[in-house]
């Protein structure tokens, strides 16, 4: 038996952009679901071994705002991330960028915690295969 559920917003893809968007929308009072084909939120940033966000700051000041800033600050306060400013790029040592280095496992856990706290329905190992407009069956 299929259960019908209504959502104000369905976010397809639970990468960092999708997760941040879903959390922001849910905090504004929308009923939100995230459809994610993988097994966690955060996408490549949480599951690929990637441990840095480039362009995290400019001249020593963090650039992220909103949900992103909250997530990264919480990782830093917990000892699971740190800003590194003016890091030479591997492809051109003369170009320096600011980076946030973090623990991807902690990012996964934090995104899930924030989503659950916001009341988001998480649909892991699920893919969107069709969509329709309107309320017709």
Give the role of each language-model region.
Residues 24, 30-31, 37-130, 134:
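Conserved N-terminal/central alpha/beta ligand/cofactor-binding core
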Residues 3-5, 29, 134-136:
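Intrinsic disorder/low-complexity segments enriched in polar/small residues
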Residues 3-17, 33:
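Beta1/beta-strand and adjacent pyrophosphate-binding region of the FAD-binding site
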Residues 5-7, 20, 95-97:
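A short, structure-level motif marking secondary-structure boundaries and short turns
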């Amino acid at each position: 038996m299929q259960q019908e559920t209504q959502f104000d917003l369905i976010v397809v893809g639970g990468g960092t952009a999708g997760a941040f968007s879903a959390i922001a929308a849910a905090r504004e009072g929308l009923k939100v679901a995230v459809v994610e084909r993988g097994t966690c939120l955060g996408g490549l940033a949480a599951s690929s071994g990637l441990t840095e966000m480039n362009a995290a700051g400019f001249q020593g000041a963090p650039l992220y705002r909103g949900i992103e800033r909250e997530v990264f600050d919480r990782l830093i306060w917990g000892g699971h991330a740190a800003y590194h400013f003016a890091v030479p790029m591997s492809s051109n040592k003369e170009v320096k960028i600011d980076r946030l280095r973090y623990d991807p496992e902690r990012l996964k856990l934090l995104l899930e915690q924030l989503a659950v706290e916001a009341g988001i329905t998480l649909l892991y190992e699920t893919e969107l295969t069709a969509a329709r407009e309107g309320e017709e069956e």
